[in-house]
Amino acid sequence: MRRIWCLVTALAVAGCGATLWPTTKVQTKSYAPDLYGCAAASARALKYSLVSNDSGGGRFEARRKYSLRAEGPDVDEYERADVLTVDIIKSRNDSSGTTTLKVQAGTLSTHGTKRGPTEDPEYASPEVKKDAQTIVTRCAST
């Protein structure tokens, strides 16, 4: 009985390791403003609109809304969007000259409730995961 309990516990802990919004990080020798420009331009080319933009801090959030017809009917849901959050992190050690590009992919579902619209995180769609990898691939070698 004890072995079964340990096995069930181990499987439960392993199952909780999955993340809703996967993050991809890559270190590059690129200059931070160039990296920011590349990531923002790539997001726009992928039909995302920048909704939060901090070029000085090296961070932005981009969203792309899509039709709910592809997902099927849900009486409360009236909007779904793919979200890309991009962080450009400068190295503290100036001698190394590395910059980290961090891209997080996610999906938000907006539901109408009695309190008003509520955004709920969903598992990242395959499209937004692919778009995040595209940005990393394009900009890591800039």
Predicted regions and their residues:
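Sec-dependent bacterial lipoprotein signal peptides
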Residues: 1-16
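Ser/Thr-rich, low-complexity intrinsically disordered terminal regions
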Residues: 17-142
